[in-house]
């Protein structure tokens, strides 16, 4: 099992509540993402950027013919399906994570690094120590 940070540029709270299993844009690392991998969802476009959810990959990466945004022709071409499992309460805010000596050098936490990035096991273990995970109910 691998760990990933997937990024959203906007809050997804309503989407998670209404549809706990959904596809996610995966233009990078598509040959490495596998069913069962853990996903840390980083929200970057809100007032308090940080890690807000944990999900699990439930379908291998696939190519979709559906085009989501005509202004971004490649967006949504490569996808994987994920199921949101936990809300992180309170969220692990970027500003707090960057104060942690063992996390401060992990580039994906410092800003936009693409839509999906691998997370080393040592980083994921530390994030799990810090996170208060609240299971999402269906």
Language-model features and meaning:
Residues 1-5, 12, 18-28, 64-138:
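Contiguous surface segments at macromolecular interaction interfaces
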Residues 5-7, 40:
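Structural motif
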Residues 30-43:
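Short coil-to-beta transition motif at edge beta-strands of beta-rich domains
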Residues 35-37, 51-53, 76-80:
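A generic structural signal for short beta-strands and their flanking turns/coil linkers
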Residues 42, 60-63:
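Amphipathic alpha-helical interaction surfaces
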Residues 43-49:
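Short, charged beta-turn/beta-strand-edge "cap" motif at the junction between a beta-strand
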